[in-house]
C-alpha cells in the first residue's frame, strides 16, 4: 500500500512539472532590473479584488464616459503612469496612490472639466489612462508579462487607501526628485500636513536622464514669458531679466522674479516646459541655459524614488508612508 502511494505521488509530481513546462514556466522569463521576480504563468491575469470590484466609476476617456470598476480603472492608470519594468512593491505603491487620489477627488465633488464623470484620462486634470491594446502596442513582446504584473499590483492592494484623519489624501506623485521632495506649500497655495519635505534616494546613477539642460535664446525666452505674463518688463538687457532666485530647504526654486514679476519656481518651470523646478540658470552669448535636476513638481511620491526603495526591501505600504507624512494605510468606505 505504501509503495502504491509513493508511485501515485511521483506520478502527480510528474504531471505538475509537465504542466508548468507546457505553460512556459521554466523558460527564461523577463525579470525586473535586479532579476528577483518570476511572473505568473501566461494568461493568469489577477482578477480585481472584492473592494475594487464593488466600486463603480464613470471615467471620461477621449471625451466619452465609460463605466468600469475601480480595479479596471487602476490597471489602466498603472499602464500609463509608471514603467511596468519597475519593482512590484513600487507598482503596488503606485496603485495605492492612484486609488487614493481618485477617491479624494470624488469625495471633493470631482472636476468641472468633466461634471458627468468621476475622473478622466487627461494627466493634467486627473491621471493618464491606457487600455490593454494601447499598452500592448507599447510593450511589444513583454505585453503579457507586464499585464499580469500590473494586474497583481492592483489586486494585491485591493481597496488600500492612504488616510489622514480617516479620509483619503491628495496622493500626488511625480517622476524623480532632486534628493528630497518639497512641501505642497512650496508649490501650491495650501500647505498640507501629509505633503511635506522628505528625503528621496535618487542619484544620477540610479535614474535615467536625471540631469537635463534647456537653452533659450533671449528672443525665445522673451516670447514665452510675455505669452504667460504680459505684464513682465523685458525691455532692458537680458542679463537683468531674471532676478532674486529664492530656494526652499529642499533646494528647489521657491520663487524667482522675471521682468519685475515674481513667479513661483514651478510656474516658471511650466512656462518654459522645464523638467523640474530644481534648476540653476546662466546667461551667456545671448541665451539662457537652465540646468535641471529631476522630473516633475517634486510634491508627494517620487516614482523613481519608490522603485529604489522597493529594491532596498521596503513594502508598498512603507513606501507610501515614507512619502506621505503622518498617514496610515487602510480602507475607506465613504
Regions found by a protein language model. Give the residues of each.
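Conserved, single-site charged/polar hotspot
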Residues: 1-334
Amino acid at each position: 500500500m505504501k509503495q502504491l502511494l509513493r508511485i501515485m505521488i511521483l506520478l502527480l509530481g510528474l504531471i505538475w512539472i509537465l504542466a508548468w513546462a507546457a505553460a512556459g514556466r521554466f523558460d527564461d522569463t523577463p525579470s525586473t532590473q535586479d532579476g528577483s521576480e518570476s511572473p505568473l504563468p501566461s494568461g493568469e491575469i489577477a482578477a480585481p479584488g472584492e473592494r475594487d470590484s464593488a466600486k463603480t466609476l464613470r471615467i471620461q476617456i477621449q471625451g466619452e464616459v465609460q463605466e468600469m470598476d475601480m480595479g479596471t480603472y487602476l490597471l489602466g492608470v498603472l499602464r500609463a503612469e509608471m514603467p511596468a519594468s519597475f519593482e512590484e512593491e513600487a507598482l503596488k505603491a503606485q496603485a495605492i496612490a492612484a486609488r487614493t487620489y481618485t477617491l479624494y477627488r470624488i469625495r471633493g465633488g470631482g472636476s468641472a472639466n468633466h461634471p458627468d464623470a468621476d475622473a478622466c484620462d487627461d494627466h493634467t486634470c486627473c491621471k493618464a489612462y491606457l487600455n490593454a491594446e494601447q499598452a500592448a502596442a507599447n510593450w511589444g513582446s513583454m505585453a503579457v508579462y507586464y499585464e499580469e504584473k500590473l494586474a497583481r499590483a492592483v489586486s494585491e492592494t485591493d481597496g488600500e487607501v492612504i488616510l489622514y484623519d480617516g479620509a483619503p489624501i491628495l496622493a500626488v506623485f511625480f517622476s524623480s526628485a532632486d534628493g528630497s521632495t518639497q512641501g505642497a506649500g512650496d508649490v501650491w497655495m495650501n500647505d498640507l500636513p501629509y505633503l511635506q519635505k522628505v528625503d528621496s534616494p535618487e542619484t544620477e546613477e540610479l535614474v535615467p536622464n536625471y540631469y537635463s539642460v534647456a537653452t533659450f535664446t533671449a528672443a525665445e525666452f522673451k516670447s514665452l514669458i510675455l505669452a504667460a505674463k504680459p505684464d513682465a518688463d523685458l525691455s532692458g538687457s537680458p542679463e537683468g531679466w531674471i532676478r532674486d532666485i529664492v530656494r526652499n530647504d529642499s533646494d528647489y526654486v521657491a520663487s524667482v522674479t522675471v521682468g519685475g514679476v515674481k513667479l513661483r519656481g514651478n510656474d516658471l518651470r511650466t512656462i518654459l516646459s522645464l523638467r523640474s523646478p530644481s534648476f540653476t540658470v546662466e546667461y551667456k552669448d545671448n541665451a539662457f541655459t537652465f540646468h535641471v535636476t529631476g522630473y516633475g513638481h517634486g510634491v508627494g511620491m517620487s516614482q523613481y524614488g519608490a522603485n529604489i526603495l522597493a529594491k532596498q526591501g521596503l513594502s508598498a505600504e512603507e513606501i507610501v508612508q515614507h512619502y506621505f507624512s503622518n498617514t496610515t494605510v487602510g480602507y475607506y468606505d465613504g
